[in-house]
Amino acid sequence: MFSTLSPSAIDDILRHAVHFGQGTTAIAPSPVTFISTTTQQSLGATYPGVFNPTTPTFNHYQHQALPVTMHTSTSSAHHTTTGHGRGRRKNSTINLVCVVCGDQAFGKHYGVNACNGCKGFFRRSVWHNRQYLCRFEGRCAIAKEHRNVCRACRLKQCFVAGMNPRAVQSERVEREQNGSPNQIEEDDYKDLSSPDTCSVEIQTDVDEQKPSSNNSAPLPSMELEMAKLSEQIVEMHRAVCSYVDPVTKRENFDMKMETETTKIAFMNAFYNPEMIGPRTPLDITGRRVATVKDVMDEWKRNFVLFSDWLRALPEYNQMSIEDQIVLAKNRYGTFHWWMCANWTVQAGCEGVCYSNGAYFPKQPEAQCIPDVKGSSGRMYDSLSIPIKELNLDETEIVLMLAVIIFSDEITELADLTPAGKEHVRMVGNRFVRMLHHHVNSKEYGEAMENGDDTQNSSESQAAVRIAKMMILLSATTNLVYLTSDNIQLMEVLHVVPSEYLCHEVQFIQNSYETP
């Protein structure tokens, strides 16, 4: 568990990154290989199925994150041209990052911020319909220093980042009409001559590099890549929700809490969630009305789930420790309400369903704690009922949770560093694209079954559905402010027994305060 790890081991885990030096081999290792053996054993014992390096979910999903926050080298800052014209001076106040490899970008190419190297690589791959094979099962990390190591994973990353192959085809038609079908810009091969990239051995096998024909296989579909990533984050979600501490560990924690009350700093609690509470099995039944103890136990269990969920997400681990804490402090409340709202739909109870078999009723006379602001009724009406009407599937629920975590409200995340703000914005947009592809595919299938084979109709249905889901985002945020008011009023009016105020309520209140 994290409490038994040294500070250096924790930094090792949270700051893991893949770095290649000059003359290194072509194998892109797992980030787990940079963690000490002792640390791996501790993580394997504490989080089997999530942090275990042998777990398919960890290995597979861990390598899908884009290194969008990597710093570029000094040499890349001296380029003064763009992909749209020669001799154009770069605005020194703009620091765009290529969403594929993390190098410096000079503008948007095919729909995303991309460097000239990735722009040319993507265009050549689409024009010539090139097929690549990865020797390492598609698990290579793509970064500026070694982006040529694996063309297969680099092309896949281009699709995942949102590059549009239709824009490439349109450009080719335009060039052919202008009488220069084979014209190639010099920046197409700029990345091949860069000292930062030429020292790395190319390990990718090329299946097909001939011009495309009617019989050639199609390029990997963006929709297929998005669907694959969606499946992987759902697997991660299931693994985190299914983890349970041993019974002896839970009993020892209960005995300890009976004799100790202490104020725990948010940062310590987040990186050591076992200090807050044990990982009990999630009991989503709502079979009994909640007591005061049930309410406080729910906050603790949900916080442990929140900590496990965020720290299992590669996109979150790419942030600095400072930015991680800022984001976590501002997202605990939204995470809690989104999970409870979906549990309420699953259990079918009229109130706020908890993870311990209890529910907090929306009727005032049945409440163990006065709901001064009516947050339980607000959650039921503004979240649970719309979720039930939309009939969200598991993938939509998980992707919406990721969108909620990485929503970039300026006022809430003002304390993030500039790099952190850009990372949150880019990752949030990527999760929105994943949600759009999933919803569009789902709605299109239903339209086909109903005899409506028009793509425009499907996209229209998907847009309406996503718009309704985005409304739920604002409803979740509103509930956070109501909850904060409730906690402050409970403490002032002394409506909660003092033994709970010493630890749980104080900690909950601290989670809404800025660093």
Swiss-Prot record:
Observed phenotype of the null mutant: RNAi-mediated knockdown suppresses the longevity caused by an eat-2 mutant background.
Tissue expression notes: Widely expressed at a low level in many tissues including the pharynx, sensory neurons, intestine, spermatheca, hypodermis, and excretory cell.
Cellular localization per UniProt: Nucleus
Keywords: DNA-binding, Metal-binding, Nucleus, Receptor, Transcription, Transcription regulation, Zinc, Zinc-finger
Zinc finger extent (NR C4-type): 98-118, 134-153
Region (Disordered), start-end ranges: 169-195
InterPro entries in the cross-refs: C.elegans_NHRs, HNF4-like_DBD, NHR-like_dom_sf, Nucl_hrmn_rcpt_lig-bd, Nuclear_hrmn_rcpt, Znf_hrmn_rcpt, Znf_NHR/GATA
Pfam families xrefs: Hormone_recep (PF00104), zf-C4 (PF00105)
Domain NR LBD: 225-509
Gene Ontology, cellular component aspect: nucleus
Gene that produces this protein: nhr-62
DNA-binding region: 95-170
Keyword Transcription: yes
Function: Orphan nuclear hormone receptor. Required for metabolic and physiologic responses associated with dietary-restriction-induced longevity. Modulates triglyceride and lipid metabolism and autophagy, associated with dietary-restriction, probably acting via regulation of transcription of target genes.
Gene Ontology MF terms in the entry: DNA-binding transcription factor activity; RNA polymerase II cis-regulatory region sequence-specific DNA binding; zinc ion binding
Family to which this protein belongs: Belongs to the nuclear hormone receptor family.
The keyword Chloroplast is assigned to this record: no
Protein's UniProt name: Nuclear hormone receptor family member nhr-62
Region of interest: AF-2: 498-509
GO biological process, one term: lipid metabolic process
